[in-house]
Structures are given as C-alpha cells and as structure tokens.
Amino acid sequence: MEALNTNVDLAGLEGRSVLVTGGASGIGLATAKAWAAAGAYVTLADIQPIEKGEKIASDLSHNGQHVNYTFCDVTSWESQLEAFRSAVKFSPRQTLDIVATFAGTAFAPGNEVDHVLFAGEPSLDAELPAPNTKNIEVNLTGVYYSSWLALYFFRLKPSDSSEPGDKSLILVSSIGGYMDSPKASTYPASKFGVRGLFRSTRARTIDIGVRCNLLAPWFVDTPLIAPVKNAMKARGIEMSKVLAFATMEDCVQAASFCAVNKELHGRALAIQPEGTFDLKDDVEDGWAGDQLRPIMKRRREAGFDA
C-alpha cells in the first residue's frame, strides 16, 4: 500500500474564501496558517475565548495575511450561521469557497456498558441523569451543521459577477471512524457518523459543483488528546513510547491536497505516521477494508491496543 504524494502548489488558494471550524487551535490552526500564508481569506471559527482568537487573527494579519476570527460554538446552529455569515462578509467577493470541519472534542473514555453498570442496579425509581453525549454533539451534530451551511453558502454568486470557481468541503473524521474501540462509545459513534455523512453526501455534492472529501487522522500530538495522554500516564504508560503519532505537517498537507486538487472528490484519506493513504472507502474497494487491515496491523505491531 503506497502513500499518496500530497504535495500541492497552494498558489490556487490566493484570494479564495475559507472557513475553518476549530481554526484557532491544533490542526485547524496549523491548516489555517498555511492557507492564509498562501493568500486565502481565512475565517477562524472557534470556541476559544474571543481575546485569544482575535489576537491570533491580528498577529497573522500584521504579517500581511487576511485572517478573521469569529467565536463559534459548533453545537449551536445560530452560532454557526453567524460564523458562516462572517466568513462571507470577510471575502472580497462576498462568497465562500472552502470549508474544513476541524472543530472537535476529546476522546471520552468508557464503553456504554461501563457507564450503564456504573449507574447501579436497575430500578424503576432510580433518578438517572442523561449520559454525556458531548462527543456526538460536537463531532457529529456540529459537523452536520457545518456541512449543511457550507453547501448552502457555496451556492452564493460572487459579488463581482465572476465565475464561482472550485468549491471544496473537507469533512474531518478520524481513523476511529473505521476501527472498533471497545474502550469508548460516544467518540467512535461520532466519527463513524461523520463517515456516514461523507458517504451519503459525496454522492450528490458534485451535482452542485462541490467536491467532498474526508480526513481520517491517526493520533496527532495536539491539546485535544491531552485527556488520553493523562489517562495513560495515570496507568504508568507514556503515550509517546507506545504510540507513534501522525504529524501535523501531514495533516496540513492532506487538507491542502483536498482544498486545491480539482480532480479529488469522494476520497477518504487516512493520515498515518507513515504518510497519507487513500482508504478507498467505496463499494468497488470493499468499503476501506482492504486498506484498513495493513494500517491496523502496523499500529498493533507498534504497540497500539484499542
């Protein structure tokens, strides 16, 4: 299985209007910086405190780049709607060209069965609090809202009457959307959900001139995985010693590959420590099974235990 060459010329991003959810931290911020450096008009839509987000945007803008920050809680439809409006208004052509859905929340440990057993013996009189579904609210509902709004605003006609140009929707799932994970339930459920959204939506987006691709990163050393690192450390395990990370650079390159490659549509890209691979998540290639087996074999040989 050969890694893809995801090196692309980012010159095609100049003047393009971009919205990145989760754009003020982690992979989202790294991607946004690369795209802004290439001349794109980038809106960072993030739940980071307004002062922090605006400082990031200001620092980048002082370098001659075009960066806009808007506070955005992706679980709120109204908040996302305002973020998308902000991105369109920030664009010189009053339009939107690329959306990448990097906003996400950390892996919530615990299988559903574990949580049910923790609730104690069943009783009709028990006061049962609702389970924590934040992973699903942020990682799936949030992505669905972003995808919906992207497809809506992509259809705006440019204010200067020019051609709309290429449109790219980049859905961010995880390799956790492709493998069993008995140690958790809500996180893989959310990431499998994004995969399902991708597989249904890609069949139609091309009808309205939108390319749709998916990113499925392996673990990347960002603040988002801090809870997992801490949980492993509490068990006496140093995460970096038993788990090879995918690189931030490979994630940014894969996102950029999706953003500017006008021939790329309907592909799911696994970002691994060894590089980026087309999972071939389609009926012709066994819904990624043939690609996933060697990937997971390498991870288990490297010490990963799902």
From Swiss-Prot:
Q: What class of enzyme is it?
A: oxidoreductase
Q: Which GO terms describe its molecular function?
A: 5'-hydroxyaverantin dehydrogenase activity
Which EC number(s) does the record attach to this protein? 1.1.1.352
* Record's keyword annotation contains Repressor: no
Q: Where is the active site?
A: S173 (proton donor), Y187 (proton acceptor), K191 (lowers pka of active site tyr)
Q: What are the GO cellular component annotations?
A: cytosol
So, what pathway does this thing act in?
Mycotoxin biosynthesis
What induces the gene encoding this protein?
Answer: Expression is positively regulated by the dothistromin-specific transcription factors aflR and aflJ.
* Domain of life according to the entry: Eukaryota
In this chain, NADP(+) is annotated as bound at S25, I27, Q48, K52, D73, Y187, K191, V220, T222
Q: Which keywords are on file for this protein? A: Cytoplasm, NADP, Oxidoreductase
Quote the catalytic activity from the record.
(1'S,5'S)-5'-hydroxyaverantin + NAD(+) = (S)-5'-oxoaverantin + NADH + H(+); (1'S,5'R)-5'-hydroxyaverantin + NAD(+) = (S)-5'-oxoaverantin + NADH + 2 H(+)
What compartments host this protein?
Cytoplasm, Cytosol
Assembly:
Homodimer.
- Protein purpose: 5'-hydroxyaverantin dehydrogenase; part of the fragmented gene cluster that mediates the biosynthesis of dothistromin (DOTH), a polyketide toxin very similar in structure to the aflatoxin precursor, versicolorin B. The first step of the pathway is the conversion of acetate to norsolorinic acid (NOR) and requires the fatty acid synthase subunits hexA and hexB, as well as the polyketide synthase pksA. PksA combines a hexanoyl starter unit and 7 malonyl-CoA extender units to synthesize the precursor NOR.
Question: Which family does the entry's similarity section mention?
Answer: Belongs to the short-chain dehydrogenases/reductases (SDR) family.
Task: Write down what this protein is called.
Answer: 5'-hydroxyaverantin dehydrogenase
Natural source organism = Dothistroma septosporum (strain NZE10 / CBS 128990) (Red band needle blight fungus)
Gene symbol here is: adhA
